[in-house]
């Protein structure tokens, strides 16, 4: 078993009772993370730090509340010379011909000061080294002294920081298959709030598959010791209500308000303390200040938007760092509601729009699964085109001007309403669009009618040699 010195920052600023509570939660989370991945671990509180005994450090870079950690050698000592001898034995070879520096921290009463210890170790190693450098040495030697214990180490690894998961109240997070919302969820988890996840599927099973892949990464990496809930709502009929039947007038904003209402109902039922979203001010049309007011108006729970002031580049960098950046993009809802986006809505208009949507219908279509079940769900990806279908009818769902500029050879152009009206079961159909979400939605609806339908994207079809007609300025 190895010994790791684990440091935290904010926990140490709390009052005695709250600090003790958070330290217990942090220690439990560390032990449970190790247990979840098949290892045993022991934790001991030592003067505002934790000592962890385990076979490896896999969980320590991923447990919220850990500021940093170091693999260390722990020794008992009687006097200063005991420590100097041990450090000399450990670092004689490591500092040979190299510059080095020594840093000592003490807790307790001793016959020597921290500076005394640094000088003594420096004197013992100086003759075999290339000198002392206290700015950027080739080898750092750290000695933390607590009572009669000395912890010796030379490397410091970064943890995620924040507060221990479970030290704050439980939230429900609206997560998509995109970049932003998983990052928002992670940031609230970092602040100590366990987050259960709510997802609205518009093109099941394709967008559900993309969402589950990201949710699995988020959960397995950052909270495998917590078996929370995932709620998946089948919202395909929203597209019919809003786009085909045109029941609503401000689709890009009204859609988000409907999602807020669904999340609100789940928060009421499961006693969540707030709703987390991945909105960043002004990033897309539904995220202007006016539209966020309209979306949030009348929601009886706090809305947490940890990304509100971040640029897309900053969000993307965090997504890559925490491992939730999507490997493939199937598009998000905005591609279905982007025809005439409203950027300066009035909350009264959005409320009237929402009244035209049967919220109860979609609440009844919510499926709940546990985090531990995510990896067991097998999505049927047969909808995705992965074979040659020369006898199929190809349908282009992109905007008409894009179709007229270039399209798959022999493809017909249909809008969403026309495509959904297809009822000929004797033919095979391949639908394509720019991002894949609209085509996946149409294919899934037609499959339920017994029609052999597939989906793909224009870019994938374009890679086939001689498959694209370039028809700029005229119709085919």
From Swiss-Prot:
One of its GO terms (cellular component) is cytosol. Its EC number is 2.8.1.4. Keywords: ATP-binding, Cytoplasm, Disulfide bond, Nucleotide-binding, Redox-active center, RNA-binding, Thiamine biosynthesis, Transferase, tRNA-binding. Disulfide bonds join 334-433. The active site is at 433 (cysteine persulfide intermediate). HAMAP family: ThiI. GO terms for molecular function: ATP binding; CCA tRNA nucleotidyltransferase activity; tRNA binding; tRNA-uracil-4 sulfurtransferase activity. SUPFAM superfamilies: Adenine nucleotide alpha hydrolases-like, Rhodanese/Cell cycle control phosphatase, THUMP domain-like. It comes from Thermoplasma volcanium (strain ATCC 51530 / DSM 4299 / JCM 9571 / NBRC 15438 / GSS1). It catalyses: [ThiI sulfur-carrier protein]-S-sulfanyl-L-cysteine + a uridine in tRNA + 2 reduced [2Fe-2S]-[ferredoxin] + ATP + H(+) = [ThiI sulfur-carrier protein]-L-cysteine + a 4-thiouridine in tRNA + 2 oxidized [2Fe-2S]-[ferredoxin] + AMP + diphosphate; [ThiS sulfur-carrier protein]-C-terminal Gly-Gly-AMP + S-sulfanyl-L-cysteinyl-[cysteine desulfurase] + AH2 = [ThiS sulfur-carrier protein]-C-terminal-Gly-aminoethanethioate + L-cysteinyl-[cysteine desulfurase] + A + AMP + 2 H(+). NCBIfam families: tRNA uracil 4-sulfurtransferase ThiI. It is an enzyme of class 2 (transferase). ATP binds at residues 174-175, 256, 278, 287. GO terms for biological process: thiamine biosynthetic process; thiamine diphosphate biosynthetic process; thiazole biosynthetic process; tRNA 4-thiouridine biosynthesis. InterPro entries: Rhodanese-like_dom (IPR001763), Rhodanese-like_dom_sf (IPR036873), Rossmann-like_a/b/a_fold (IPR014729), ThiI_AANH (IPR020536), ThiI_fer (IPR054173), ThiI_N (IPR049961), THUMP_dom (IPR004114), THUMP_ThiI (IPR049962). Residues 54-156 form the THUMP domain. This is tRNA sulfurtransferase. Pfam families: Rhodanese (PF00581), ThiI (PF02568), ThiI_fer (PF22025), THUMP (PF02926). Transmembrane segments: none annotated. Residues 388-470 form the Rhodanese domain.
């Amino acid at each position: 078993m190895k010994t790791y010195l684990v440091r935290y920052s904010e926990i140490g600023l709390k009052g005695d009772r709250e600090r003790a509570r958070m330290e217990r939660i942090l220690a439990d989370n560390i032990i449970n993370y190790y247990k979840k991945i098949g290892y045993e671990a022991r934790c001991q509180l030592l003067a505002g730090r934790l000592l962890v005994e385990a076979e490896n450090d896999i969980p320590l870079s991923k447990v919220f509340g850990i500021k940093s950690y170091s693999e260390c050698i722990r020794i008992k000592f009687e006097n200063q010379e005991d420590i100097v001898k041990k450090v000399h034995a450990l670092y004689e070879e490591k500092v040979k011909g190299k510059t080095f520096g020594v840093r000592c921290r003490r807790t307790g009463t001793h016959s020597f000061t921290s500076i005394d210890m640094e000088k003594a170790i420096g004197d013992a190693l100086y003759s075999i080294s290339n000198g002392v450098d206290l700015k950027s040495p080739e080898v750092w030697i750290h000695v933390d002294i607590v009572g009669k214990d000395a912890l010796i180490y030379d490397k410091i690894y970064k943890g995620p920081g924040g507060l221990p998961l479970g030290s704050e109240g439980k939230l429900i997070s609206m997560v998509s298959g995109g970049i932003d919302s998983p990052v928002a969820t992670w940031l609230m988890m970092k602040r100590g709030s366990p987050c259960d996840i709510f997802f609205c599927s518009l093109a099941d099973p394709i967008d559900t598959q993309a969402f589950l892949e990201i949710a699995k990464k988020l959960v397995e990496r950052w909270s495998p010791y917590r078996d929370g809930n995932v709620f998946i709502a089948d919202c395909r009929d929203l597209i019919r209500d809003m786009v085909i039947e045109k029941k609503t007038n401000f689709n890009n904003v009204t859609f988000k308000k409907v999602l807020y209402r669904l999340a609100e109902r789940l928060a009421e039922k499961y006693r969540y303390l707030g709703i987390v979203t991945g909105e960043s001010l002004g990033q897309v049309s539904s995220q202007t200040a006016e539209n966020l007011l309209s979306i949030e108006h009348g929601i009886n729970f706090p809305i947490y938007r940890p990304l509100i002031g971040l640029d897309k580049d900053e969000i993307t960098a965090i997504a890559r760092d925490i491992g939730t950046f999507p490997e493939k993009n199937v598009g998000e809802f905005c591609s279905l509601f982007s025809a005439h986006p409203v950027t300066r809505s009035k909350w009264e208009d959005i409320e009237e729009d929402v009244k035209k949507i049967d919220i109860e219908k979609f609440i009844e279509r919510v499926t709940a699964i546990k985090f531990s079940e995510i990896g067991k769900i097998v999505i049927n990806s047969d909808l995705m085109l992965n074979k040659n279908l020369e006898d199929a009818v190809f349908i282009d769902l992109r905007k008409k001007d894009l179709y007229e500029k270039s399209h798959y050879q022999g493809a017909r152009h249909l809008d969403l309403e026309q495509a959904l009206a297809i009822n000929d079961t004797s033919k095979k159909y391949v639908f394509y669009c720019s991002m894949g979400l609209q085509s996946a939605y149409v294919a899934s609806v037609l499959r339920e009618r017994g029609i052999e339908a597939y989906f793909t994207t224009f870019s994938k079809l374009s890679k086939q040699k001689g498959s694209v007609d370039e028809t700029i300025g005229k119709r085919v």
